[in-house]
């Protein structure tokens, strides 16, 4: 995944020092795009090990419309723990906006169900968009959406997805986001009778936290290995019917994990 290494190198060489909400400090660039051909392998970083279980369970949690960390904790995933309240609640974060966006007239809009039907009925639509950025709810969220809007595009029997991410923690968060949205694209392609095309990742403020710089330099010394293959149970035809057991990552041979602290 040379695209990701190029981003690390750009930030380390051209990044601007910025203050941030967490008080940690960052090196930051503004505006960056990476493209991943999903037919060329599943874009899971090989220059450090990523936890597939956490990536898959978080995505399934989003798709359930859940905003409490109980499901994640029950499945051994702790990535949202720092932001949850004493009851495990996060406020109206991703799952709520994806599955039950509150309309002004009192309706609840299921953006994911709608997008699947739109892709089936009108694949050439330029309105195949899901947004998690709801200005009316942002102040009630434990953490406002970083990956905040994505759009699908159908051409030649293939489904592509472009994600806009306003804030990108490049060392810890972005590798998760790449794998998560690549997987979501594959899942929606399967249930709409399409093949996976590209995942395009567009970043706004792309940053390395000051306590991740040495880890990024270490990662850049490692040579990328062949990408793995993601195999999805072809029997699943409902985007809300997927379970963790329906996904098998074959041929994943990464370099060892690199530890880094999350900026809260």
Swiss-Prot record:
InterPro entries: Thymidate_synth/dCMP_Mease (IPR045097), Thymidate_synth/dCMP_Mease_dom (IPR023451), Thymidate_synth/dCMP_Mease_sf (IPR036926), Thymidylate_synthase (IPR000398), Thymidylate_synthase_AS (IPR020940). Transmembrane segments: none annotated. Keywords: Cytoplasm, Methyltransferase, Nucleotide biosynthesis, Transferase. Pfam families: Thymidylat_synt (PF00303). It catalyses: dUMP + (6R)-5,10-methylene-5,6,7,8-tetrahydrofolate = 7,8-dihydrofolate + dTMP. (6R)-5,10-methylene-5,6,7,8-tetrahydrofolate binds at residues 169, 263. This is Thymidylate synthase. It comes from Rhodopseudomonas palustris (strain BisB5). The lineage of its organism: Bacteria, Pseudomonadati, Pseudomonadota, Alphaproteobacteria, Hyphomicrobiales. The gene is thyA.
């Amino acid at each position: 995944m040379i695209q990701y290494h190029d981003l690390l190198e750009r930030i380390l060489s051209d990044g601007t020092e910025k203050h941030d909400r967490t008080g940690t400090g960052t090196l930051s660039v503004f505006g960056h795009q990476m493209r991943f051909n999903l037919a060329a392998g599943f874009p899971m970083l090989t220059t450090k090990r990523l936890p597939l279980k956490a990536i898959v369970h978080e995505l399934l949690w989003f798709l359930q419309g859940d905003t409490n960390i109980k499901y994640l904790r029950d499945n051994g995933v702790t990535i949202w723990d720092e932001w949850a309240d004493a009851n495990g609640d996060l406020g109206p974060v991703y799952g709520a906006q994806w599955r039950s966006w509150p309309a002004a007239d009192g309706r609840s809009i299921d953006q994911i169900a709608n997008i699947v039907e739109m892709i089936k009925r009108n694949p050439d639509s330029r309105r195949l968009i899901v947004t998690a950025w709801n200005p009316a709810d942002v102040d009630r969220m434990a953490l406002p959406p970083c990956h905040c809007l994505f759009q699908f595009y159908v051409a030649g029997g293939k489904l592509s997805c472009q994600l806009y991410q306003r804030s990108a923690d490049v060392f810890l968060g972005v590798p998760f986001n790449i794998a998560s949205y690549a997987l979501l694209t594959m899942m929606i392609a399967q249930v709409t009778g399409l093949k996976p095309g590209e995942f395009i990742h567009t970043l706004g403020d792309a940053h390395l936290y000051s306590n991740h710089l040495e880890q990024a330099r270490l990662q850049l010394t490692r040579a990328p290995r062949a990408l793995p293959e993601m195999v999805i149970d072809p029997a699943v035809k409902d985007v809300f019917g997927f379970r963790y057991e329906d996904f098998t990552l074959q041929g994943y041979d990464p370099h060892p994990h690199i530890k880094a602290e999350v900026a809260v």
